Amino acid sequence: MSDAALSSRPAASDTPDAPALPLGTSDEGGLVSGAAPSEAPPPGELVEPGRALALADFAPPSINAGERLIRLAYRLGIPGSTLAAPLRKAAKPRLLATVGNPLPGSKMAGTALRAGHFLVHGVKSPIAQIDFAGAARMAPPLERVVHSFSWLADLEACAPREAVASVAERIMGAWLSANPKPPSRPGKGPAWMVGNAGARELNWLVHAPLILSGSDRVLRAKVLTALGETARWLDKNVGRAEDLLAEVAGWCGIVAAGLLLPDGKPRRLFGEAGLIRALGELVGDDGGVLSRSPLGQIEAIALLVRLRACYQAVRRDPPLALEAIMGLLVPPLLALTHGDGSLGSWQGSWAMDAQELAALVEASGVRTRPLRDVRQWGYQRVVAQKGILQFDAAPPPLAKHARTGCASTLAFEFSHAGQRLVVNCGGAACAGGLIPIRLEQGLRATAAHSTLVLDDANSTAVLIGGKIGSGVSEVDLDRRTLIGEKNAGATRIEASHNGYVSRFGLTHRRILILRDDGTELRGEDLLVPAGRKGKTGKVGFAIRFHLGPGVEVGLSEDGQGAGLALGDGSYWQFRIGGEGQLAIEESLWADGQGRPQPIQQLVIQGLVSRGGGSFAWLLKKMG
């Protein structure tokens, strides 16, 4: 076993100002050890979302001295068959149990597969034209679907097994012919990235009846051989994963193989310790993944849900630490849902449908409330009756954690009664579907989010490959409750970032005040000189408010406001404080399937002195 598989990485104001917008009356090295695992709440029990992580949450399961020796020997490269049964021949390849699929796929995508196409984010790609060897690179979303075999869940969802098994076997045979042997290490094409290989091993095991129930004995033997070879490849290469989430996927594949393939106990012990360590590095103190991406949060939950199904198939309880971590992952994700249960558009995600999210949360077995203040993950959530405000109050993720990192600091989304009024464009992660790949970097830019932009520059540099460069490094945050009479109280959030200081000498500060009845959102965007000697001259600014789908907008006669008509028949008014010009521009929004939808945006724009400026605005429900 390679050194990489044995290596470990290190873990990853006193007196607030008065409101600027006052409201009127209107064991071994490399494995986490040293603490007993904490008890996880039983499935279905309401979890308190504010509970902080304890060291015990990331402790490997308690094992005896003999099992510790087995785990150490396996890490050193002694075959599992030798450790599990040293006095007999290695067992023949077979599966020890059948796994029940805990997460149904897309019937529409499965139907497309039966018709001969992969359907990914609205684009049909003929199976016959897919290069399974990976010499000709595909769009990233299609590449992930093809090589992770996540499409098996879609196929299983669309028809009885006997009706779709032949399709699965045909694609499986083509993939195995193009990938007969694993390479020595990752990097030999997308099929052998650790994230794809780990997810593929897990999906093969969860959906094994689709690819092993046919009459073709030669294919069956090839599939069983591929299961074993992929597991051994992951044993050696999981430490070379492209990022932490990919490493977690690799460890999940290892543990699943240890549970369901013969002589797997040494691999399972090795994999459980590695998985819990990797999760400890992936997840922050409040349960949010360090990429700050809700899609990353969803992927981590889905991996653990499928892995738990493998434990259930062999009638073995998963480690308590895995259940505890599952309970920590769900509340931050729910903080980014709107009133209709669908997802906000953050860090490259699209507005995932409520039904899909609800199915994931139900499968997790975690009953909990959304976190209100996910401060370390970087998001604030305010619920005011039917109004929901989501606010990005943190720097973008570090480059090593980002997959589709976005320069979205101080952006917000706002919905009322399930109707989205203000959104972010989203969709960078699904670029390559109906959203052209050339728009990927633009959808990650500051201008694609509902916040202030200076001189058309990003508050944090947006780099290729989903990475993030220099820019915002500090965000100050203050949140408080304002007491008022007759439901006139409010929640006030004030935050500032330094992303424009080095270029323009200005700090962006944003104040948002949402009334407790959810019908009025006041805002103020301030540009404050960062030093005693401010720079001279003026710089262009634009404060963008991307409007939700179905919102009809028209400017007022004085040019200082706009009327917003929503699909539910309600009417809202937007007003500005006199500084800047208000305009309507075209925009784009990624819907629940990752498809582009045309929307509009309100833009306050003009020139501001390097000495600073203040721009107030109001969004109010009129009827």
Question: Could you tell me what each predicted segment is?
Answer:
Residues S2-I127:
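Extreme N-terminal leader/anchor segments
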Residues F118-E143, E156-P160:
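Asp/Glu-centered strand-loop micro-motifs enriched in Gly/Pro and often flanked by an aromatic residue
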Residues G284-G427, S609:
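Carbohydrate-active enzyme catalytic cores, enriched for enzymes
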Residues P140-M326, F574:
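Aromatic-lined, polymer-binding surfaces characteristic
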Residues S2-P10, L21-G24, P140, G198, ...:
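CBM-like, beta-strand-rich accessory domains located in the C-terminal region of large
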Residues A249, A407-T409, A447:
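Short, solvent-exposed loop/turn segments at the edges of secondary structure
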Residues G110-T111, D373-R375, G405-A407, A445, ...:
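Short solvent-exposed loop/turn micro-motifs enriched in small/polar/acidic residues
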Residues A115, W377-R381, A411, H449, ...:
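Short, acidic/polar N-cap/turn motifs at the starts of alpha helices
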